[in-house]
């Protein structure tokens, strides 16, 4: 129905049989697509490889931070960060989509953070990678008392940058239109320390 979603990230599934060694494949991928949140999980029955640059959530004590990415520009050798920032700011589509994701992530944080503590630290900054520029905003908040790690994960996952917004109605639309469950794809990987700090 009209108005059920403002932005939707529909995905397709591609499969291919291969005898490639997972470790070699991972390192080859890193050479052409360096990302700070990359990982390789090896198991007896499967391997999982990811090269995402995004920090969905980071919790230290009672402070939680999210850094949504919404906006990507191929980088050339002569291109500068200033050029990339000007491009994102002047591109109406990129700017509006970024604003929508930021608003949604602020809303997610407000469910688990103290009133008035959800703040934007860095709005619409440009992060430089080997072949890309990303449009990134950093948002932080102070957690309410008695908020569990389960509460945090439930509020923040999945991230808005991989589904669209608003979250619930867009997820329902994706579930009805995508033929195969995403499973691990566009999921989150991270850790929870013994003291409760976490990063995904």
Locations of the language-model features?
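Extended alpha-helical targeting/anchoring segments
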Residues: 1-200
């Amino acid at each position: 129905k009209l108005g059920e979603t403002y932005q939707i990230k529909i995905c397709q599934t591609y499969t291919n049989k291969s005898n490639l060694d997972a470790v070699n494949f991972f390192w080859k991928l890193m050479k052409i697509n360096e990302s700070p949140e990359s990982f390789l999980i090896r198991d007896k029955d499967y391997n999982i490889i990811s090269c995402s640059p995004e920090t969905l959530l980071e919790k230290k004590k009672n402070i939680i931070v999210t850094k949504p990415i919404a906006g990507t520009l191929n980088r050339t050798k002569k291109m500068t960060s200033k050029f990339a920032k000007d491009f994102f700011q002047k591109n109406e589509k990129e700017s509006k989509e970024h604003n929508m994701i930021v608003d949604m992530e602020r809303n997610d944080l407000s469910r688990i953070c103290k009133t008035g503590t959800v703040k934007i630290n860095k709005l619409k900054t440009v992060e430089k990678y080997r072949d890309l520029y990303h449009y990134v905003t950093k948002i932080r908040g102070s957690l309410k008392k008695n908020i569990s790690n389960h509460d945090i994960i439930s509020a923040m996952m999945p991230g808005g940058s991989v589904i669209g917004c608003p979250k619930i109605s867009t997820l329902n639309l994706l579930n009805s239109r995508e033929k195969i469950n995403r499973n691990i794809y566009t999921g989150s990987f991270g850790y929870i320390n013994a003291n409760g700090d976490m990063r995904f």
